Amino acid sequence: MLDFAIFAVTFLLALVGAVLYLYPASRQAAGIPGITPTEEKDGNLPDIVNSGSLHEFLVNLHERYGPVVSFWFGRRLVVSLGTVDVLKQHINPNKTSDPFETMLKSLLRYQSGGGSVSENHMRKKLYENGVTDSLKSNFALLLKLSEELLDKWLSYPETQHVPLSQHMLGFAMKSVTQMVMGSTFEDDQEVIRFQKNHGTVWSEIGKGFLDGSLDKNMTRKKQYEDALMQLESVLRNIIKERKGRNFSQHIFIDSLVQGNLNDQQILEDSMIFSLASCIITAKLCTWAICFLTTSEEVQKKLYEEINQVFGNGPVTPEKIEQLRYCQHVLCETVRTAKLTPVSAQLQDIEGKIDRFIIPRETLVLYALGVVLQDPNTWPSPHKFDPDRFDDELVMKTFSSLGFSGTQECPELRFAYMVTTVLLSVLVKRLHLLSVEGQVIETKYELVTSSREEAWITVSKRY
């Protein structure tokens, strides 16, 4: 355990620490502007803790020192990039490794991955096909689950406050588990069991390992190990069941099983995808509905598009593709919420950004939360304005950051479709309304969420 680890208190601190733990440190500041270590042993960890989150620390750092900044995590140099221009200089569009996946694997202490370029290309293609095929095969299921939620909300009186975050997490768990892992999760008790174990694992990989508390608390450690073991056991059974057999329902795991992967790679990849997809889908659904409740004009425009595309007919995969404004709503949701505020890459070889040399084996952070609120790139950055994505150059910029197009992570692509179907079903029948006086505070972690429950009300359109 790193000697400075006890000071880490947030998920993202744990995330950065896990990556740094795996690689040698660079001790050169390389003349990059930034702050010197607050403490010799702990670097700028106290500053990050005092800021409340890594994202908020980076916002302040980039405001003070510009687009390329440096700080110290323990005795290790970290460089952060905070504008579109400098990110474009560093992002390699041909790079096949997914930093989100890499960091989660580090936290779970998984060892596979890091293969050759051809192997990584093959795995990326498997992921893409897995998402496409599972969404196509399970569209009717996704529609059914969306309509079940609609029926539940239609039964509420207009004055009833709906716990949005809770309902979206439940919806995401039910839809993702069945589409990724199959019919086992038609049983609500299996979904509840998965959600409980998922919550334990997701929480502990963020706080328990790096602050040392997990090893010191045997009860918590056993709970974590039991939860992870149960998740892995379920996945192993599903993988075994799906091997060498044909099913009418194609699930995400089928694509991995049919690829040239060993059992451990299939287990790890399906675990990462399951963990990440549930959270990203739940939070994207939550934030999209939150923003719609506070923007009557956007909700009206989305309703008109849904009516125009579907009319009185059913929601179909072909017509879903025509929802251009809905796509813009989701892109603007990701941008405004700063859904994934930080990403990272390890500097493989010495590189140059602007006039600054970045030493080899430096951890380079992509301060996406900073970039997505940069007024030089996004006019009126704090305004929820899906119309900004009518501009093709704006969409191209967004895609270059990995939030759409060929560079988006598969979990986000999956979440986009699930959320699109849900909104198509809900907005057609319901007005989504905010609760008067509610202030939603943001909690910045690996995936951004509301600090407390987000409440809404609904009323019938007809």
Curated annotation (Swiss-Prot):
Top EC class of this enzyme: oxidoreductase
Residues noted as binding heme in the record, renumbered to the chain: 409
Transmembrane helix found in the keyword field: yes
GO cellular component, one term: membrane
Alphabetical list of InterPro entries matching this protein: CYP450_20A1-like, Cyt_P450, Cyt_P450_E_grp-I, Cyt_P450_sf
Cofactor (UniProt): heme
Record's keyword annotation contains Lipid biosynthesis: no
Family: Belongs to the cytochrome P450 family.
Protein name: Cytochrome P450 20A1
